[in-house]
């Protein structure tokens, strides 16, 4: 015989309240009197009750759940964004369903369809370029959408981020103004739209200073090891190289470590700059120059925008540019 699954009515009877009160407490604890809530919580803890949210997610107008798509669990960038999102959702009793699509748009499409099947109230996407089918499903779902890390080009609904092209331009100009350089190479990673925008910003700065752009951009996911490999290849192909601008800090830290291995003085012989301003990069010796991006704030703002639009569909604050900072460090 199967064990009896504890019901809301069982908890209500033990706590001396109505089933409706227990249901309200599970959905929104703050809407129940403190003493009553504590009594219900105590009963739930004593009997190890775990709410079954699936029926409510499918039947209710609101599931109090948000979907989040990220391209990598290994990148600190997205850990910071998730922390920002959770800082908001936890305060409003929202749950998050997180899916990783490994920088593959077909995988993103599949993940979006899966998340929509849970009747999510809104969704956060890490990129702005999707398959036609992904866009079709999102538009049909008629839920709020926020796209992250970019405020250029068309958007599905809302967006929060910064101008990648301008940020790259400002950093490369800073490199060229700090020291006389003749050959600064762009070190990229796996091809994506943001990487391309940064490359365009790099090109803008190089051409402004009458220098020729150079690029090394393998189809591989970023890592410090990849940065070392890229820097090794770059120096072999360009012995007179005197600077590298990297699409992110992982690549830049790898380049810096390779220079240390080769006994190349940074920044005296070679200038190195990264992108995103990770804490580990600032703690390197010498401290890595980088574009500091507001990852936590981007996540927090994205969640706030979603919840605001869920509560008020007339919300029209659709583009938020949170900017960036240039950190000089000691590698320019």
From Swiss-Prot:
Ranges of the DNA-binding region feature: 8-27
DNA-binding as UniProt keyword: yes
SMART domains in UniProt: HTH_LACI
Source superkingdom: Bacteria
Protein's UniProt keywords contain Kinase: no
Domain HTH lacI-type: residue ranges: 6-60
Swiss-Prot/TrEMBL GO biological process terms: D-gluconate metabolic process; regulation of DNA-templated transcription
The entry's keywords: DNA-binding, Gluconate utilization, Transcription, Transcription regulation
Pfam name, any one: LacI
One GO molecular-function entry: transcription cis-regulatory region binding
CDD domains assigned to the protein according to its UniProt record, in alphabetical order: HTH_LacI, PBP1_GntR
InterPro entries to which the protein is assigned, alphabetical: Cro/C1-type_HTH, HTH_LacI, Lambda_DNA-bd_dom_sf, Peripla_BP/Lac1_sug-bd_dom, Peripla_BP_I
Functional description taken from the UniProt entry: Idn operon regulator. May repress gntKU and gntT genes when growing on L-idonate.
Protein name: HTH-type transcriptional regulator IdnR
The species this protein was found in: Escherichia coli (strain K12)
Lineage: Bacteria, Pseudomonadati, Pseudomonadota, Gammaproteobacteria, Enterobacterales
């Amino acid at each position: 015989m199967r064990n009896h699954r504890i019901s809301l009515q069982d908890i209500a009877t033990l706590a001396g309240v109505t089933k409706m009160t227990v249901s309200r407490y599970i959905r929104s604890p703050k809407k129940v009197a403190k003493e009553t809530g504590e009594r219900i919580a105590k009963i739930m803890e004593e009997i190890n009750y775990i709410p079954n949210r699936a029926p409510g997610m499918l039947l209710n107008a609101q599931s109090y759940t948000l979907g989040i798509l990220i391209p990598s669990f290994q990148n600190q960038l997205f850990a910071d964004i998730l922390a920002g999102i959770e800082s908001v959702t936890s305060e409003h009793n929202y749950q998050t369903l997180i899916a990783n699509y490994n920088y593959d748009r077909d995988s993103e499409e599949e993940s979006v369809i899966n998340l929509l099947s849970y009747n999510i109230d809104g969704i956060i996407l890490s990129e702005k370029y999707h398959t036609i089918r992904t866009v079709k499903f999102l538009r049909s779902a008629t839920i709020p959408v926020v796209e992250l890390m970019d405020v250029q080009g068309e958007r599905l609904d809302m967006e929060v981020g910064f101008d990648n092209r301008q940020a790259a331009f400002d950093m490369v100009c800073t490199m060229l103004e700090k020291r006389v350089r003749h050959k600064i190479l762009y070190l990229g990673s796996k091809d994506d739209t943001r990487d391309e925008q940064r490359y365009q910003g790099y090109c803008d700065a190089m051409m402004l200073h009458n220098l020729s752009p150079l690029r090394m951009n393998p189809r591989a996911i970023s890592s410090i090891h990849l940065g070392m490999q890229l820097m090794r290849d770059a120096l072999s192909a360009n012995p007179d190289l005197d600077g590298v601008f990297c699409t992110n800090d992982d690549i830049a830290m790898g380049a810096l470590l390779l220079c240390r291995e080769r006994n190349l003085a940074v920044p005296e012989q070679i200038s190195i700059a990264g992108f995103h301003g990770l804490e580990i990069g600032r703690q390197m010796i010498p401290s890595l120059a980088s574009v500091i991006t507001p990852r936590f704030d981007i996540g927090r703002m994205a969640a706030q925008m979603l919840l605001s639009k869920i509560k008020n569909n007339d919300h029209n604050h659709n583009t938020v540019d949170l900017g960036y900072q240039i950190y000089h460090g000691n590698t320019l």
